[in-house]
Amino acid sequence: MKNREVIANLILLVVAIIWGGGFIAGKMALTTLNPVAVLMYRFALGALLCGIVFWNRIKKTPVSVIKKGVIIGMIQMVGLTVQLSGLQYTSTANQSFLCTAYVAFVPFISWIILRKRPENKAFVAGCLALVGIGLICLDRALSIGIGDSLSIMFSVIFGVQIVVVGLLVDSDIDVFQLSFFQLFTAAIISFCICLVQGNVINCFNTESAIGVLYLGILNTFVAFLGQNYAQKYTKDTVAALIMSLESVFGFLLSVLYYNEVITLKFL
């Protein structure tokens, strides 16, 4: 069981690296697409790949797993819509840090949902996270921009998703079945929103197409399968801590790709 936990944590580390690159991919996709359209293509591609590869298992999915996938997919859709909307108004470096503040929120969200009081060190971590958020976001007028505000909101929503996944997913559940209905639910919701907005078909350029492919194949199909599998064999707080490393990879990759300036407040 210990070896399985180590493997699960290594998988989550790979997920963090993939998600780190996802900040750049998201920015690329937004060059010609709006946030909901990006999510529609992303989740549709992820669900399609999952359905093709694991159809023999998916067609045997019990109703209980479908319900869990729908719940997680709805939370995921809301969170990522908020995240991409925020990315339109802030830098990838800013968002890569702010979106991973969920590592400090998870113990408190668990407290609310599971009635488990966090350890004292969780309160210290929460205070440090707030200080970091303040250094990154606050300007001289002590106000926070809309992009940074939405990024912080996403970190709270994703913290809820981590706790809910830990609550609903046990070691006996088929993660491929769960992931398909999670992605399928998010794809359907985003498609319906695009229908209302009149943005079902959008024009792509090379940059946005590469961004969508990265998000659909790696960030969605590969990473969410990895997350759902690994969280069966490790603790919620450990999972949150490892996945928060996406901020490090996201920041470093954004500095390399966009030549963003490293300032003292990030360090």
Q: Residue ranges of each PLM-predicted region?
A:
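C-terminal transmembrane-helix exit sites in multi-pass transporters
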Residues: 49-58, 83, 102-124, 248-266
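Hydrophobic transmembrane alpha-helices of multi-pass small-molecule transport proteins
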Residues: 50, 70, 118-138, 158, ...
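Transmembrane alpha-helical segments that form core, pore/gating elements
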Residues: 24, 47-50, 106-108, 112, ...
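Helix-helix packing/entry segments at the starts of transmembrane helices
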Residues: 40-41, 81, 95-101, 165-187, ...
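Specific transmembrane alpha-helical segments of multi-pass solute transporters/efflux pumps
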Residues: 18, 22-23, 51-99, 135, ...
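Juxtamembrane helix-entry segments on the extracytoplasmic side of multipass membrane proteins
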Residues: 4-8, 32-36, 40, 61-66, ...
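Glycine-/small-residue-enriched transmembrane alpha-helix faces in small-molecule transporters
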Residues: 1-37, 74, 82, 142-167
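Hydrophobic/aromatic residues within transmembrane alpha-helices
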Residues: 29, 38, 42, 86, ...
